[in-house]
Structure formats: structure tokens, C-alpha cells
């Protein structure tokens, strides 16, 4: 079908991630239906015929190839899940398409705070720039680029599902707690460390991909003061 240039949709039913690099390269549309249950067929038809605008996001990373996965017998977190994977994903954690488009802008938060501050506000504007009403899952991730201990490449710290009519824009507010900004040291103690924290907000995780353009906005927060221990 694909070779004959017949418009084709690959409907995939799976309980977890699969290696589908050939399909991603050659099939113009892929719908992951997971396990839809009794009314799964109706839901798939509603999406395919445009009666429902999809807004689902991946709860797992779709890797480009099996070799990207760590050895099954290794319990080291290096390379596991979106939090520690440093390669290029086929489809990243948090990714999902819609029949409309969303644009992120005006990411605002304090540029510097003390390590002991309990709540730090983050605001971002999301606009539906397409021609169809739809829902978006706004996701906030943080990373610690200058830490010398093992920390995640990125970590989800908040998300909100919003509904926007075509052309509508909304300002979304998150609040980052001390625990959100903390790291766990080699002794298992959770601490807020002085230094830079990168904040990224968008429609998926801010990781390198083979197929999906990165649509996030980012800023940086400077934490000053002494190390603040949360768990004692």
C-alpha cells in the first residue's frame, strides 16, 4: 500500500513502546490506539474521520532501535526512561499530535531565588494557532546542567490539560516547590543545591528526536545560598 502511494494510516495497538523506525519513515500517519477496549473501534473511527481532535501524549519513550535500550540484566539507571536517555528518541515521552497547532511564548519566572524558597511561580502563554478547537497538555520540565552528581537529563515537574478554541490564548501558571528543584545525592539525601536550573515548557519532553521538531520555550533560574536539605 505504501509503495503504491495509497494514503495509509498505521493503527497500532500495543501496551508499551515498540521499535517502529520503518513505519515512522514510510507511513504518512500513525495512530497509537493502545488497548481501546469494547468501544476502541468507535474511538479510532472518530479520530480518523476528524470527528474528534486527538490530544493524547505518550507516557513512555519510543526508542529508535532496540540497541538504545540498556541491558536487561543491568539495574543502572543510565539510559533508562526519558529521564536518563541521552540519545535521539523516535518519539519522546510526552509527545502527541493534534489536528491543530499550539505555540508557546512568554515564559516568565524569577531569574534568581534562594535555595530555601518554598514556592516559585512559573507562567507561560499557550495559543491555538490552528483552525480547529483542541486540547493541549502543557508540560513543565527541569534539568540541572551544572551538577556534578548523577541527576536526570530532564524531569517532568508539572502538567496541565487545557482546552483552547481556534485562535485562543491562555496564560498557564505552575508553582515549583523545593522538592521539585531538589536533587538526590549519592547518600540518598534530597537537597536543593545552589547553581543553575533550566526550566522548559512545551507539548512534549525537551529531548532530541529523529522525527518530532522541538517546540518548547525555556529559561534559567539561578539558585543562590547554601545547600538546603529537605530529608534529614
Show which residues each predicted segment covers:
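Cell-envelope/glycan interface and biosynthesis
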Residues: 1
Amino acid at each position: 500500500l505504501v509503495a503504491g502511494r495509497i494514503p495509509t494510516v498505521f493503527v497500532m495497538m500495543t501496551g508499551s513502546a515498540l521499535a517502529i523506525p520503518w513505519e515512522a519513515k514510510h507511513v504518512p500517519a500513525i495512530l497509537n490506539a493502545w488497548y481501546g477496549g469494547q468501544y476502541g473501534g468507535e474511538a479510532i473511527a472518530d479520530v480518523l474521520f476528524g470527528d474528534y481532535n486527538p490530544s493524547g501524549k505518550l507516557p513512555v519513550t519510543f526508542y529508535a532501535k532496540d540497541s538504545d535500550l540498556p541491558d536487561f540484566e543491568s539495574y543502572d539507571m543510565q539510559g533508562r526512561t526519558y529521564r536518563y536517555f541521552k540519545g535521539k528518541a523516535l518519539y519522546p515521552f510526552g509527545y502527541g499530535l493534534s489536528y491543530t497547532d499550539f505555540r508557546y511564548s512568554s515564559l516568565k519566572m524569577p531569574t534568581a531565588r534562594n535555595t530555601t524558597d518554598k514556592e516559585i511561580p512559573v507562567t507561560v502563554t499557550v495559543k491555538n494557532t490552528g483552525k480547529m478547537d483542541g486540547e493541549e497538555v502543557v508540560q513543565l520540565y527541569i534539568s540541572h546542567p551544572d551538577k556534578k552528581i548523577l541527576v536526570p537529563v530532564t524531569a517532568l515537574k508539572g502538567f496541565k490539560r487545557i482546552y483552547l478554541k481556534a485562535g485562543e490564548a491562555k496564560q498557564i501558571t505552575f508553582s515549583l516547590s523545593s522538592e521539585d528543584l531538589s536533587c538526590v545525592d549519592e547518600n540518598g539525601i534530597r537537597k536543593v543545591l545552589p547553581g543553575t536550573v533550566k526550566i522548559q515548557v512545551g507539548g512534549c519532553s525537551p529531548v532530541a528526536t529523529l522525527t518530532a521538531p522541538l517546540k518548547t520555550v525555556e529559561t534559567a533560574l539561578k539558585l543562590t545560598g547554601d545547600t538546603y536539605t529537605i530529608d534529614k
